[in-house]
């Protein structure tokens, strides 16, 4: 029975579609055993708004997040007898000060967990568009190695100070990287030393790396992380989970058949499923076999939706 540890809805994310209730209903229809709500955390500065949010103010984002948590709790109450539902959030690490905001949100809402993601390098978005990726590159003197280094330094800072249970799309920095930059990524000793350090640190505190299938719909031949990284994680004894990173009901379980082939190719036979702890306190992590994750999966979505 499938799982997803990372998702969004158009109700609370402007670049997604559909209502949160539509998302969980689709997950139930497809036979999911466990599904996590993880809308984006709000940002507290006007300069950090995305182009799609320029008509808003930071206080609007905080109001939306509050509405999200309340709706997620309602849905858990209504559907919790049909599916394991967790209520978390995906981090917005824009600068070091962002971590204090994340901690305050967790204190206020007692979230089940964070998906620890980095979408910005030196406060510039790196996964919103190729143009903004290039802007981030220009900020570091058009030195792709430095851009990769800064990304993994940000990721390390986030992990050290927040200990997110799930590490989101570990190599997102590569999404819009042109071929010459990808060669730098592949061959840079400095970059790979940071990668190994980050993986080792996550393993040390019990962090879980997601196999994120959204990379397939964005044109990759693998999920996040790419194969060399995934093999390194396995070598270091990392825990792995599965995420569709769906942005609406039309993407629930999308490309999971490709993920199964990818995991089989990499020799991965088990994944982690996150559940609430005894009496509803905290979370517990259970190991499930890859074959069990795909049993009773009724994938109703297409292959190439974006």
Swiss-Prot record:
Organism: Schizosaccharomyces pombe (strain 972 / ATCC 24843)
Family to which this protein belongs: Belongs to the PHP hydrolase family. HisK subfamily.
Catalyzed reactions: L-histidinol phosphate + H2O = L-histidinol + phosphate
A GO MF term: histidinol-phosphatase activity
GO annotation, biological process: L-histidine biosynthetic process
Domain of life: Eukaryota
Record EC number: 3.1.3.15
Involved pathway(s): Amino-acid biosynthesis; L-histidine biosynthesis; L-histidine from 5-phospho-alpha-D-ribose 1-diphosphate: step 8/9
Protein name: Probable histidinol-phosphatase
A GO CC term assigned to this protein in UniProt: cytosol
Keywords recorded for this protein, A-Z: Amino-acid biosynthesis, Histidine biosynthesis, Hydrolase
Coiled-coil intervals: none
Family annotation (SUPFAM superfamilies): PHP domain-like (SSF89550)
Gene3D superfamilies in UniProt: Metal-dependent hydrolases
Catalytic class of the enzyme: hydrolase
Family annotation (Pfam families): PHP (PF02811)
